[in-house]
């Protein structure tokens, strides 16, 4: 893996030099855009809207529109805005890991100590495991400030970017009916169904089936075969009574 950021994790007066590596990888198929008439590749060009000529990449700069003009922002300006956050993941507090709502999660990154046999790294990793806590921190990655949690995963300290509170939309925008009454009998049956389906989390057994099926179709078409299209068979509910549906679901699970 290639590191995408080099800096340090700071907590208290302790500074741990680390490298950051992306912990996730895309499984999407790499599809090219083609002209349907001759299957030639589609190319996008960076065109100057005044001269209508293509602009070399090294001549492109970033600008912010301010009072009908543009202020040009250079790499040094991004770093000057928060020099310490560009190089340090400063832990501001420790929180219960389970208290972080999954809605806030974004991307995760592995950290690796920049030096071998780094005792401070080993200490923080072990302390996070023992305490069940996660460090809450802020840092700048790719010119964007991110809130993040610093938490242990097996033998690595992981930095997971999380959203700021203002990025989460308020549920008041939804048309939700809070006046629906659920009977105790229905609730008990719902809880029984949840317990029936409850099992230890094993994400490794879940595969990207859509990706696999799409790849099968591509391989069939490459061989000149017509792919077999599976028709969706909608599940029919047995009646409109919620209790009966829950009871039937329990029976189906037991007989599986």
Place the predicted regions along the sequence by residue:
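Boundary segments of small protein-protein interaction reader/adaptor domains
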Residues: 1-256
């Amino acid at each position: 893996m290639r590191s995408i950021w080099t800096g340090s994790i700071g907590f208290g007066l302790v500074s741990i030099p680390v490298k950051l590596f992306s912990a996730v990888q895309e499984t999407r198929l790499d599809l090219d855009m083609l002209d349907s008439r001759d299957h030639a590749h589609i190319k996008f060009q960076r065109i100057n809207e005044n001269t209508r000529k293509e602009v070399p990449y090294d001549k492109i700069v970033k600008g912010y529109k301010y009072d009908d003009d543009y202020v040009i922002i250079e790499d040094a300006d991004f770093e000057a805005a928060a020099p310490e956050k560009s190089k340090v993941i400063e832990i501001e507090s420790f929180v219960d890991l389970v208290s972080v709502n999954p809605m806030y999660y974004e991307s995760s990154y592995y950290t690796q100590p920049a030096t071998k046999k780094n005792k401070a790294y080993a200490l923080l990793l072990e302390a996070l495991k023992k305490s069940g806590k996660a460090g809450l921190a802020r840092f700048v990655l790719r010119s964007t400030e991110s809130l993040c949690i610093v938490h242990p995963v097996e033998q690595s300290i992981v930095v997971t970017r999380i959203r700021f509170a203002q990025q989460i939309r308020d549920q008041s925008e939804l048309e939700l009916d809070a006046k629906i009454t659920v009977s105790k009998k229905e609730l008990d049956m719902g809880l029984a169904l949840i317990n029936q389906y409850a099992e230890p989390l094993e994400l490794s057994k879940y595969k990207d089936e859509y990706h696999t099926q799409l790849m099968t179709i591509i391989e069939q078409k490459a061989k000149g075969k017509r792919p077999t299209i599976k028709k969706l068979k909608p599940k029919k509910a047995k009646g409109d009574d919620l209790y009966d549906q829950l009871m039937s679901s329990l029976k189906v699970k037991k007989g599986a």
